[in-house]
Amino acid sequence: MMWWAVWCAAMVAGSVFTAAAPPTDSIDLMQMDPSLADDESLGFAMQSLSGRYAAAPWLYLLADVSHDPQRMAEFSQSSGRARPKRKMPSLSINNPMEVLRQRLLLEVARKQMREANQRQAVANRLFLQNVGKRGAWGEPASYLYNN
């Protein structure tokens, strides 16, 4: 258990000496000037934080983002919907009908196979009754030989 505390202390000590992450160009956010804050109540907070985060220009505070409802409406219209539509269960009968069709086709195929097997069994029985006999193939053996 002691190793966990030592590891945490080492991570904290190591993170103190690491440099801040470099700014990335992949984010399309405008960096706003803290002196131009829309809300007057945020002005005092921004000036006190500006010295603390001056070395990390990649850090954007949520207090800097404007809360303009017109801009939010434009954003929601440009994206298509204001909120995503929930996926409701479908009441379609297509899937159950397809399952019934498949089961019916399987049942018909089984019936045809059963009938084909029965026809083959009858043909095999006739062949075995007439093997080695001189009579006609279609006539039973008892008719040819009356002993």
From Swiss-Prot:
Coiled-coil regions, chain positions: none
Keywords noted in UniProt: Amidation, Cleavage on pair of basic residues, Hormone, Secreted, Signal
GO MF, one example: diuretic hormone activity
Domain of life: Eukaryota
GO biological process: body fluid secretion
Valine amide modifications at: 131
Intracellular or extracellular location(s): Secreted
Propeptide: 27-84, 135-147
Signal peptide: 1-26
InterPro entries recorded: Corticotropin-releasing_fac_CS (IPR018446), CRF (IPR000187)
GO CC annotations, alphabetized: extracellular region
Function comment: Regulation of fluid secretion.
Family from the record: Belongs to the sauvagine/corticotropin-releasing factor/urotensin I family.
Name recorded for this polypeptide: Diuretic hormone 45
Organism classification: Eukaryota, Metazoa, Ecdysozoa, Arthropoda, Hexapoda
Encoding gene (name): dh45
